[in-house]
Amino acid sequence: MSTSSVPSLTYFQGRGLGQFSRVLLSYLGIPYENITVTEISDALRATLPYGQLPIYRDGDFVLTQSSTIARYIAKKHNFMGKNLEEEFLVDQIVTAIHADIFPAFNNPVPEKLQKLYEKYFGSFEKKLQETGFLVGSSVTLADLYVYVGFDYIRFRGEAALSSELSDEKYPKIAELKKFFESNEGVAKYIKERPETKF
């Protein structure tokens, strides 16, 4: 368990579900302790509410479930939109990525995956073309989530049908990727991130 005064995020060394919060914390410039493990030991498991990672500790407050962690960080740091309606629109995109897109590419059926990508990333691309942002008139967790999800699928390669997500097909999402990766905190995180399979 971390004894640091800054928040801590515990997850495996790979990108996986920890990537969303790691990129978010880096983008927002929030100091945190990035604790990586190779396995969930019995001692660690005993501290986990549901026996799984990632887990986020902010003082005495403990959260698990990757999308919940990201929402908490974003809400705490005013990155969930400017009002209640925008917050729920952000939440809608976060849920789509976690509930529909990620489970599908982990057990891919090419035809279904292609349609799923076109459905969601096509919608995201259209919204970015229209307004420049996925929700409201400023960058939110929704934009970051689409960037991280898009980038992770391409990182996973053809097993995840990554060729369907080209810069040519989704130029605005490609611009979103450049935007986040030009951020000093995100650029530093990417440079220091170890090469892993997942």
Curated annotation (Swiss-Prot):
Q: Where is the GST C-terminal domain?
A: 83-198
Its Gene Ontology cellular component terms are:
phagocytic vesicle
Sections of the chain in a coiled coil: none
Residues reported to bind glutathione? 11, 45, 52-53, 65-66
The record ties this protein, via PROSITE patterns, to: GST_CTER, GST_NTER
Pfam families, alphabetized: GST_C_3 (PF14497), GST_N (PF02798)
InterPro entries, per the entry: Glutathione-S-Trfase_C-like, Glutathione-S-Trfase_C_sf, Glutathione_S-Trfase, Glutathione_S-Trfase_N, GST_C, GST_superfamily, Thioredoxin-like_sf
Any one GO molecular-function label of the UniProt entry = glutathione transferase activity
State which Enzyme Commission number(s) the record gives.
Answer: 2.5.1.18
Residues with PTM N-acetylserine: 2
Top-level class of the enzyme under EC nomenclature: transferase
Enumerate the catalysed reactions.
RX + glutathione = an S-substituted glutathione + a halide anion + H(+)
Domain of life per record: Eukaryota
Keywords assigned? Acetylation, Transferase
Please report the stretch or stretches of sequence annotated as the GST N-terminal domain.
Answer: 5-81
Q: Which GO terms describe its biological process?
A: glutathione metabolic process; response to curcumin; slug development involved in sorocarp development
Task: Give the family from UniProt.
Answer: Belongs to the GST superfamily. Alpha family.
Q: What does this protein do?
A: Conjugation of reduced glutathione to a wide number of exogenous and endogenous hydrophobic electrophiles.
Sorted alphabetically, which PANTHER family does this protein's record hold?
GLUTATHIONE S-TRANSFERASE, GLUTATHIONE S-TRANSFERASE ALPHA-2-RELATED
Protein name per Swiss-Prot or TrEMBL: Putative glutathione S-transferase alpha-2
From which source organism is this entry?
A: Dictyostelium discoideum
